[in-house]
Amino acid sequence: MQDRQSAQDTQLGESTELTATACGQPLSDSIAAYVINLDRSFDRWQHIQGEAEKLGMAVERVAGVDASKVSLAEAAFYRHRAFVRANGRPMLPAEYGCYLAHMSALRTFLSSSADAAIIMEDDVSLQADLVERAAAILAATPAADVVKLLNHRTVLHRSIARTSRGDDVGRCLFGPQGSAACYLVTRKGALKVLEKLEQIELPYDIALERGWATGLSVYSVKDNVLHLSERSHESQIADRAKYRSIKLRGLRKIPTHIFRIIELTRRIKYALG
C-alpha cells in the first residue's frame, strides 16, 4: 500500500500534499470531521470554518488535489477503458483530483485516533447536531462501513434502522444516488475503501456506494443530514455542457447500457439482502 501511495504522490508532486487546519474545539476521539478544500478555493474553507466556529464544531481541512494539469493517459490507477465502458465517457481531470482527495482524506483519518470520520466537501452547510446524529447512526448500524449522509436522490429506500435522533437509515433499490459531499466512515470502512477503490473505474461518489461490488457494508440516510450550500451551484468539476460533449453516443454506448442494467440488478439484490 505504501508503494502505491508513493506512486500517486510522485506523479502529482506537491499538489497531493495534505494540509490540515483545525478550528473549534479539539477533534473528538470518537468521530472526527474533515473538509476537502482546494487551495485555489480557500474562500470556501474560510466560509465553512466560520460556520463551524459559530456552531462550536471541530473540523479539519484536507487540501484537495488539483489535477487540471495531469495527463490522464499517464494517471496512476486510472483504468481508462473500464471507466469509459461503465460511464459512457472518459474521466475528467477534476474527477480524478476529487477521487484522490477523498482517498487522501481517508488516510488522514486513519492517521488520527478517531474511531470514525465524517468526510465532507466544502460546498455543504454545517448543522449543529451533525456529530450527534452521526454517533446515533453508528449506534443503530454497528456493522456499517460507510453511511452516506447526503444524496442527490433517494428512490425506493428500504429502511434498515431508525436512530435515536430520528434518522431513517437503509439502502435504495434505485441509483446511483449521487454525491460524496458528506458521508460517515468507520476505521475498518476506510481501510476497505482504500483497498477496494484503489483502481479508478467510476467517479468516486458512484464507486463509494457500490457495496455489492466492493464487499463494503454501505448504507444511506433517507433524508439528508446536511444540505448543499449555495456554493454547490459553482461546480469545480464541469458543467452539463462539458459532460454532454464527451459522452459516447449510439452503438458505442451499448456496453454502458449493459453495465447499468447489471448494476441495477445487483443493487436491488444488495438492498434487499
Label each residue range with its predicted role.
Residues 2-3, 9-120, 124-273:
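An acidic/histidine-cluster motif and surrounding catalytic segment
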